[in-house]
Amino acid sequence: LLVFAVPYGLGAGAIDAALNNYVALHYKAKHMSWLHSFWGVGTIVSPFIMGYALTNKTWNSGCRIVGALQLVIAILLLVTLPVWKVNKVTEETEKKSVGLVGALKIKGVPFLLTGFFAYCAAETTAMQWASTYFVEVKGISAERAATFASLFYIGITVGRFISGFITDKLGDRRMIITGTAILLCGICCLFVPMNSYFLAAAAFVIIGLGCATIYPCIIHSTPNNFGAENSGAIIGIQMASAYVGSTFIPPLFGLLGNAVSFKIMPFYLIFFFVLMITMTELTFRITAKN
């Protein structure tokens, strides 16, 4: 499993960067929101697939089912390759890319990467530690905690689907600000000193709704902020910064939670979300001047 995880991760990262760049260049913001909405559908469906495998077969049967689904997707992509062809002007523009090193030297890119890192760090922390928060802080059973934690995924999935209908009217920047305001309201609900877990459950739904607009809008705004010729390289680095944040920051929260208390979750989340909106706003201001 460890050996196969390496090429699996390489392939997933390549698809993530390439697909996001393609949609950012050739489609509207609403399409980007709906694309990432179906990521949420996958996160909701996947536990049922593994649950079916564990109940009726073995755990590795779940991996086979997912592998078969991905093989079908790969075949569909190969069959529909002619549909993905772009016009020559766009092809020439993409060939002029400055590359990874050159992209890092563009004004505003370091701020963008820091903001994206902070967002993915906070989002993944909320995803992975919500159930533990309910158990350790609210004192409910692990089974019920897992159910309440899934509300975050529902919030982010529904939010991205709904935002697709309004994002073209408001624009990427306003959607990012709106999403940040919503998720901060959700975090404020976690600060309310109530023993009832219903408010905490509602808080994670609100945080998910707020997160819904941020990831797709940051990516979709990249070609407009830095130029289509640079978007491929920049979005690739964005994905790398996203993976760094989602890989290392949630375990850090686990260490802090065990050492101090899992009650620090709202403080932890608000730190990274404030860092995210600060860096993102700096990016938009710098690129607006340029």
Named regions from a protein language model:
Residues 28-38, 142-143, 228-238:
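Loop-to-transmembrane helix entry/capping segments in MFS-fold secondary transporters
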Residues 4-38:
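Cytoplasmic helix-loop-helix junction between adjacent transmembrane helices
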Residues 84-112:
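Juxtamembrane intracellular "pre-TM" segments in multi-pass secondary transporters
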Residues 107-150, 154-158:
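Extracytoplasmic gate region of multi-pass secondary transporters
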Residues 3, 34-85:
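Helix-loop-helix hairpin linking two adjacent transmembrane segments in secondary transporters
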Residues 49-57, 134-135, 166-167, 252-261:
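Interfacial helix-cap and linker-helix signal at transmembrane-aqueous boundaries
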Residues 225-262:
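A late C-terminal transmembrane helix in Major Facilitator Superfamily
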Residues 170-218:
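C-terminal transmembrane helical hairpin of 12-TM major facilitator-type secondary transporters
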